[in-house]
């Protein structure tokens, strides 16, 4: 199992495709996806384009859908929810399809949506995703971060290192690091693994969220390691369900 990490969607090689890919957006899209599916959402359908989201959502009854939209860390006007994992509680999302677009995470999902086995990862479901991958290890696994508007993000690299640390430990001689980006992510995880929330808060995107208001609950939720057993799996392009 060859493991490679790409900081943002634009870094993903053109004309190549791995056996499996994992998309990360710690603050906050993939954390929100994990919690929404854990709390009973029927599916999360992701969009980079807002007009496409609105058109698709309009085909569903209002009673069985929610629109989640975020730009610049804030909820988009006219949408039901923003991009907060603490907002997708069971009484809001159970049984509903969530139509979601965010500043960063949904772009990375769109970039690798053609990969046969596609998952999303956050710190709360790290072990669940690792265990799922280890049941049928891919020859080549791409871990794709989301960054912030095309730039590197500390928190996504932290989670990439956290996942790789588990996979390398469990697979022993059958797994290897395929690029320097992942080597750096592993080192970052070793530095912050005892206090991931501090890393999230120090990251530039964490500082951006702090500047927007009180997001303490989001930080706690996003940093809570191995809390969930849910594995979000793409079942058709752009549509994620719980496994």
Swiss-Prot record:
GO terms for molecular function: 2-phosphosulfolactate phosphatase activity; magnesium ion binding; sulfopyruvate decarboxylase activity. Keywords: Hydrolase, Magnesium. It comes from the Bacteria. Its EC number is 3.1.3.71. The keyword Magnesium applies. It is an enzyme of class 3 (hydrolase). Disulfide bonds: none annotated. The keyword Hydrolase applies. Its cofactor is Mg(2+). Belongs to the ComB family. This is Probable 2-phosphosulfolactate phosphatase. The lineage of its organism: Bacteria, Bacillati, Cyanobacteriota, Cyanophyceae, Synechococcales. The gene is comB.
